[in-house]
Amino acid sequence: MPRTQTGARQRNRFPLETWEIIAMPTSSNYLVKGILPRTGLAVAWGAPKCGKSFKIFDLVMHIALGRNYRGHKTRQGIVVYCALEGGHGFINRIVAWKKRYLNGHDRSVPFYLMAQSLNLIADYKDLITDIDDQLGGDRPAIVVIDTLNRALIGDENKSEDMAKLIKAADALRVAFGCLVMFIHH
């Protein structure tokens, strides 16, 4: 380890882990074990019209309720779902899901829908403030951005535009210590 002028050990800005200590984490650093980490950035992608939004909505509802998802343990937490392709159609999905899985019982579920248009690059600070304010300081476990294309005012094929989007998503991740998931169009 480098030393300062006084001979004291200096803390490294970029510490290196030795081969011997590198191992799979034994703690519960997941939202959905074997599928989603507890924090970071994730992207759900697939062919157009293959049901990505339906599948991810089902997955995050299992997180909100703390229910196993297809045989995988979940860590219960608050879900913020930004439905940028129009809230009306998405509300129909929510109502259908409630009927199917909650048997018509309207119980409290830590799921929050945001169905306004969003330019994540320009609006991420306001989004962080509004989420924090409306959740009373509670932190979401996951923020879903559906779709990446709708959240990006720019070209997803330009590295400069994508770098700005990732920086904005990272700000959400850091602010809440959560997973940010994009659904690709």
Residue ranges and their predicted role:
Residues G51:
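Conserved glycine(s) of the Walker
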Residues K33-T39, G71-T74:
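Phosphate-binding P-loop
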Residues K55, L59:
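Hydrophobic positions on the alpha1 helix immediately C-terminal to the Walker A/P-loop
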Residues A44:
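Hydrophobic anchor at the beta1->P-loop junction of P-loop NTPases
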Residues M1-Q10:
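Short, small/acidic-rich helices and loops at N termini and domain boundaries
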Residues M162-H185:
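Substrate-engagement module of ASCE P-loop NTPases
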Residues H62-Q76:
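Post-Walker A helix-loop "phosphate-sensing" segment adjacent to the P-loop in P-loop NTPases
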Residues W19, T26-S27, L31-V32, A47-P48, ...:
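Conserved inter-motif catalytic segment of the P-loop NTP-binding fold
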